[in-house]
Amino acid sequence: MGANENVRRVRESRGVTKSFMARGLGLSLQGYSHIEEGNVRLDVERMKKIGDLLHVDSAIFLNDELTESAIKPA
């Protein structure tokens, strides 16, 4: 999976809405949706901000195994 898909998976596992993410990133809801759909490439700064909003290390978005560990219940 790509980083965009991993962002969606982590966001959903945390129960965070797209609207919350959009506001936190200073984007419209449609703009944020484009990120999760893979229509927008994620740069390092945006990944860091997304990680901050979801309270995770942004590196997990680049690695499927780390993403899995982040979405599994503790």
Locations of regions flagged by a protein language model:
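A short, Lys/Arg-rich alpha-helix, primarily the initiator
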Residues: 1-13
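Residues that mark the N-terminal boundary/hinge immediately upstream of a DNA-recognition element
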Residues: 6, 17, 43-46, 57
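Alpha-helical residues within the helix-turn-helix
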Residues: 12, 23, 52
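Short alpha-helical DNA-recognition segment
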Residues: 15-34
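DNA major-groove recognition helix of helix-turn-helix/homeodomain DNA-binding modules
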Residues: 26, 45-60
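Short, basic-rich loop-to-helix N-cap that marks the start of a DNA-contacting helix
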Residues: 39-49, 68
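Short, charged recognition helix plus adjacent turn
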Residues: 52, 59-74
